[in-house]
Structures are given as C-alpha cells and as structure tokens.
C-alpha cells in the first residue's frame, strides 16, 4: 500500500523513470562520469565514458574498452591486454550503466522515495541471471543515477556516480590502440 502511494505521488512508474534515466545517460554524442566502486574485494575509483552501448572504463588497476562487440582489458600490473567478446552477464558486471538496457527484459521493477530521489528496485524474473537484484537512485530533475547497488552471487556492490557530463566522444576512444601500449602483451581470448 505504501509503495502504491509513493508511486502515485510521483505520477510516474518505475519503468517511466528508468526510460528517462536511460535517455539521459545514453546521449548520442556521449557522456563521461566519475565513479567509486565498493563491495567485497572490489574497491576502486575511476572514470567512465559511454556512447550508446560502447564504453571505456579507467581505474588505477585496469583500462577497459568496449566498442559494442569486442572488449579489450588492459591490466596495468601485468602490462597485458585481454581481448574478448563478452556475453550479457559479463557486460552487466562491467558497465555500471548497463541497467539502461537490462531493465526492459527479465526484471520486475518497483519505485519508492529515498532522500528526495527516486529509488528504483529491480528484481530478476530468472534465477540464473548473474544480477538478481539492483537498486538505482535517480535524481528527480535530471534523471541521472547517483548510486547503483547490485546484488551478485558473492554479495552486494555499490557504485557511486558523480560528475556526469555530456561529451562529444569519438568512437576511437572505445578501441584499444596498441601504439599507446607498445610493451603490452596482447592475449586474444575470443
């Protein structure tokens, strides 16, 4: 009952809020943001650039490029690049903004108010999915997500998102350029 009142007071459904968040984050020319990842053994800070389904993630440990099909992961300490073609669950684990696509199929959604923001709760309809549950805090005026909490088989991860800006991103930044890493060993896992 309280959830129905909360949703009614917004005048929007969880899906409508997620549609607006997806539109805000999937700017055709691209966006950039900073993030902090916390949970389990994965604690790191970094930046992300997104353009459609393409992304580039930079942290102190790795740089990941994804051009919509191929992924390159550069591991700094090993000076190596792993090349792969990730599946849906691997992409969900890597890209904090992947909820843009995943909420449309295979998830039930509800919404409540938390600290003046929309809090959308997604639960998987398929017990085999790698992401079983997710909470997304969304700003009510900009529809930009500020926090994403994801439940994996090993527990919860929290991604805090900040400094989200529209950007005119070249497709080149979503590809690994071997000239920038001349000593890196390239390992093709495809």
Each model region followed by its residue ranges:
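Non-transmembrane domains of secretory- and envelope-associated proteins
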Residues: 114-117, 125-133, 140-190
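A short, surface-exposed beta-strand/turn
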Residues: 50-53, 65-67, 134-147
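N-terminal leader/targeting segments and the immediate start of mature chains
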Residues: 2-43, 49, 54, 79, ...
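Flexible, surface-exposed loop/linker segments and immediately adjacent secondary-structure boundaries
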Residues: 86-116
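Short beta-strand segments that buttress and anchor functional surface loops
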Residues: 34-37, 56-60, 119-127, 147-151
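An acidic-aromatic
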Residues: 45-94, 152-158
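Soluble periplasmic/extracytoplasmic beta-strand elements of cell-envelope proteins
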Residues: 32-34, 72, 121, 160
């Amino acid at each position: 009952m309280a959830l129905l009142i909360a949703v009614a007071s917004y005048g929007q459904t969880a899906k409508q809020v997620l549609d607006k968040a997806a539109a805000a984050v999937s700017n055709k020319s691209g966006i950039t943001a900073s993030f902090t990842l916390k949970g389990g053994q994965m604690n790191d800070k970094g930046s992300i650039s997104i353009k459609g389904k393409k992304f580039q993630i930079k942290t102190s440990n790795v740089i990941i490029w994804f051009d919509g099909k191929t992924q390159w992961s550069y591991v700094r300490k090993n000076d190596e690049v792993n090349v792969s073609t990730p599946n849906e669950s691997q992409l969900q684990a890597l890209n904090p903004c992947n909820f843009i696509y995943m909420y449309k199929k295979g998830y039930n959604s509800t919404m409540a108010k938390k600290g003046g923001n929309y809090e959308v709760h997604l639960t998987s309809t398929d017990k085999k999915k790698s992401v079983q549950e997710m909470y997304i805090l969304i700003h009510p005026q900009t529809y930009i997500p500020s926090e994403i909490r994801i439940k994996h088989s090993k527990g919860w991860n929290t991604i805090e998102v900040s400094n989200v800006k529209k950007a005119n991103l070249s497709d080149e930044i979503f590809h690994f350029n071997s000239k920038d890493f001349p000593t890196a060993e390239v390992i093709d896992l495809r």
